[in-house]
Curated annotation (Swiss-Prot):
GO biological process, one term: intracellular signal transduction
Keywords: ATP-binding, Kinase, Nucleotide-binding, Phosphoprotein, Serine/threonine-protein kinase, Transferase
Name listed for the protein in its UniProt record: Mitogen-activated protein kinase 16
Gene3D superfamilies per the UniProt record, alphabetical: Phosphorylase Kinase, domain 1, Transferase(Phosphotransferase) domain 1
Domain of life where this protein originates: Eukaryota
Motif (TXY): 184-186
Source organism of this protein record: Oryza sativa subsp. japonica
Residues with Phosphothreonine modification: T184
GO molecular function: ATP binding; MAP kinase activity; protein serine kinase activity; protein serine/threonine kinase activity
InterPro entries: Kinase-like_dom_sf (IPR011009), MAP_kinase (IPR050117), MAP_kinase_CS (IPR003527), Prot_kinase_dom (IPR000719), Protein_kinase_ATP_BS (IPR017441)
Gene name for this UniProt entry: MPK16
Family that this chain belongs to: Belongs to the protein kinase superfamily. CMGC Ser/Thr protein kinase family. MAP kinase subfamily.
Sites bearing Phosphotyrosine, chain numbering: Y186
Amino acid sequence: MDAKKGSGEPEFFSEYGDASRYEVTEVVGKGSYGVVAAAVDTHTGGRVAIKKINDVFEHISDATRILREIKLLRLLRHPDIVEIKHIMLPPSRREFRDIYIIFELMESDLHQVIKANDDLTPEHHQFFLYQLLRGMKYIHAASVFHRDLKPKNILANADCKVKICDFGLARVSFDDTPSAIFWTDYVATRWYRAPELCGSFFSKYTPAIDIWSVGCIFAEMLMGKPLFPGKNVVHQLDLMTDLLGSPSGETISRIRNEKARRYLGNMRKKPRVPFSQKFPGADPMALHLLERLLAFDPKDRPTAAEALTDPYFTGLANSEREPIAQPISKLEFEFERRKLAKDDVRELIYREILEYHPQMMQKYLRGGDQSNFLYPSGVDRFKRQFAHLEEGVAQGDKTSPQLRQHVSLPRERVVRNGDEPDPTADYCIKLHVGEQPGHSSVTDGLNKPLLSARNFLKSESIGASQCVVIKEKREKDEESMSEYMNEAADGVPHKIAQLKT
């Protein structure tokens, strides 16, 4: 070991200091794509979620999806989008198979919140929707279409903070991108799919496809169940027109799919159902906005920015405090335009991982080939911890984690310029007051589960992971945003209501 230390590799190996930084405590979720574990950040004492993605390169299509999501989550840094904190450096540049991604912690997802709570207040609905639209405003400003918005892809915590995740189906729109190529792999969840996607209705798609999904999610908050649970495409269109009425002749004439055009043209005329009848007891202003979001014709839907100016958000929205992203460079997604081999995707993912290892990035850019490491990496140690804990889970035991074996002193990760505190951290609606530090679940006044810490997504999405939360103490937020959010919270004490205790 001493001889190796003298070879100049300690500085290289010191990038693996994060191997000692995270101590895996338990496996908390398993899916077809990997394992999610809770871990402790030994530098801060806070807990994080670590997602291990197995055999990333077994299928190139899956590896490309992971590459796309890692890249987008790096480029789209916003309080309402789930954040990758770190990615472990693999032990070999050209031979690694698994990826370990460290995420911020969220307790549950919007699907579970809606399912477990039949007494969410209008204030909850408003705040959830505001954050969702604010995140989509940022995403769309970057010319990104999410394409798979649904409650399970909206993570949530006990403070009613929500964050958009699962960008595996997302695409960046460029002016010269052929729409036929752009949308050929669209397979998003049918219940939240815009009508123009149900039958390839229109030749040019817009961010309005995401706005429709936001409307479906908002309606589900109000109803407590999905609005359009279609069994197939035809049934989906029937459910839409049952509520919204038959589309206009002008809308039908612009549909490019002949079968869909003929089906809607021959459909019996259906009257529009008043939303006040479909959603009895709902806030009239909420229903007015919902009608705009669920316009059958995409040109009639508001943009996310326009929706945020709706009177429904009076006293809450402030366009000056809503960040706007710059369009993403076409070069970032050049790989979408060519056929990739397994080694191509591996190299591209490795390049993304280096974004979280600044010193290694410099060596990489200088042409230093570090394909064979002299020391076991943090990933190697995590493999042992995961294997140990998974074995206990398989046997039904409450397995204790292996003791860490320090091979070097922990070193602080180099902070990137984009590492900033969440400017909305102080603006929250408590779902429950009195939770003891360290508890892993939240209950409402009826002592029923509110946000279960065991509701983990089984998604191939790298961001679809939830773990037990012990919210880390954040540094002071940016002054302007903090003041704004505190003013909003102080100014509407009853509006930001708590559930009954």
